[in-house]
């Protein structure tokens, strides 16, 4: 059975959750953290994913890639690229398909990977984390992404999940996932005809800011409006602090960290920590050793200084709030609660700005870091055939209108707006077209000028074939089922011809008709499905050979990572065995080994140690196993004698304890019999 898995794919850190019969649980990673760094690093032998990537980030800065969610599905010529590129220390390149990729060194060779591959590497890592923690199969995943993700980006993240060996049952907007978490676990929501509770969710994470207005009733929610600033987040605060200290250190220490990627990254990491400290304290020290040119730096910052530093950023808080309210056709007075999520909302001055924008106090009833992942896990569980969850209905909304067009074959309209902006999804529409033969259809955004800069207006194209027009007929009616699926992806589910047939239908009897009245029939015309047509889709999704090639490459890299990890484990096991056996041979094992055995084994241990730190320092798994088994062949023999003697001692001790217990019991019984006898004698007297 597959365990439903929810992933909050964060720009800086990601959170994993699983749904089980007893509820929704956060999954801790290999170092017991409840979030995992969203990093992919590359080394001399293998990849460093998640925590391993973070550990090596500073020393491996050119070969470590973060900000994964920002480049998935992004064209190299997209206007956002210039903004995003400043946050990357690895080399970004243009791929053959015009997408953004990265060039790194892996196993001593220059390698180029697409953003989809990088995301797949990380998703594969967290999949493995969940499998290790839950000891269960992981097949299905629900991934939470920003509401501003385009159709192309949603397909790309779904492709990444497939490359990682997962079935993406749903790509959900992250704030919607948090709202599901709110709605499912809140017990005081209005019911029936009562006025719904209107809640504004403000999510400010590492790289973006989303405001969504939701209407809640028990067991359901509806998204009323969503707006965002996709270039406003915690990393902007971190960079503002870093730039402040870069200027200070240039003047104070005569070093320019902007010229050294490693130095800049170290100060950036320290700036993030300083930001968090100042969220709880009014002042904090700031220092780093050997930043560059063997120079140690130190300084400090107060909360007031930080607030002054980020004032230009705070002016951007209001706009998404205003736009979300306008889309929902509401005012701040209509909002019942304002829930804040995302780590950046912990900054006191930012919280004040959000509160002022709504003119309301803020609520933190949700876990700011984990609500999205838990909501995603619950949504994944809804799609599970084996796990029962409480009923909960939710609908998201189309941010932009989507139209479908088709070949003009007869005198009729050539296009139609099918999913207007603000309408809910998932949703299905059925249209009827008069067709004279095979045809094509396209989906596109109705008003491209309203899209974010760089977003492609065209969404998908379909070829619909197999249409047979009867002889003598000019055209035939074709029913086309258009759908916006739960992930917000636009598809054509079905296309088929119809025909009218005449059938006999029972005429309803009058109410006063006798019970034995004979039924009457009438002939009616019904429209029924005739022939299903073939649909070939041309979307942003990877299919066939391109997808299989990426899966094959990922599997090969995963196998290499696994081999390197297992080899390191075997090497460590050999090293530990050498030191442990040498110590025990001098102490507890000493009485159980002959002098000849001691001499031989001591020599073997010395040779193995010398080999391990020389020729065997970078050897293969099989050789470490062979060396271990060579030592164990004699070491285990001596250990067996020691264990046999220890068992003999335990048995002897157990026998003595049992004999002592029997003696004590016999003494107690004798004393009891004596007391009873004395009592009888006393009774006779």
Swiss-Prot record:
Protein known as: Heat shock protein homolog SSE1
Segments of this protein annotated with the region Disordered: 651-685
InterPro entries reported for this sequence: ATPase_NBD, Heat_shock_70_CS, HSP70_C_sf, HSP70_peptide-bd_sf, Hsp_70_fam
Main location group: cytoplasm
Biased amino acid composition, Basic and acidic residues: 673-685
Compartment(s): Cytoplasm
CDD domains, alphabetized: ASKHA_NBD_HSP70_ScSse
One Pfam family here: HSP70
Cellular component GO terms held in the UniProt record: cytosol; nucleus
